[in-house]
Amino acid sequence: MDKPESMKVGSADDLLQLVSFNIGDEEFGVDILQVQEINRMLDITRVPNAPEYVDGVINLRGKVIPIVTLRRRFGMTRKERDKHTRIVVVELSGQVVGFVVDAVSEVLRISREVTEPPPSIVGGVREEYITGVGKLPDRLLILLDLEKVLTSEEGGHLKEVA
């Protein structure tokens, strides 16, 4: 039986290995090499005078990590956190950051051949955050550039928060 086109194995250069997660009805993918770990929701400590996009900080094994809720960052409506809510811990330009997502779906590999450049707006997410769209057999996967989700200035503010 043939594999779906998006799941065919090619050379390592032809494949993207991604962590996929959901925010609302949209499914996003980020490069697995940026992801350090995925955690269940932890208690977030609010930080006075933190930027609006920062929820606060968590203590992860003795390291203080700033937390950003992607829902808020993307201008989506708030949602109560539940048993599926996760914190995706990533490293961006030497700064460790936790992004709150509604749920983590899976780790997957897709061929670069099934990706397309981003349309101007996808699911309310601005184009500059998106590197492309992966066309899977049963759904579309929005490929995020986490380095662009926070500007370099905002990344500097995160260092101050932590």
PLM regions and their residue ranges:
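An acidic, low-aromatic, low-complexity terminal/linker signal
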Residues: 1-162
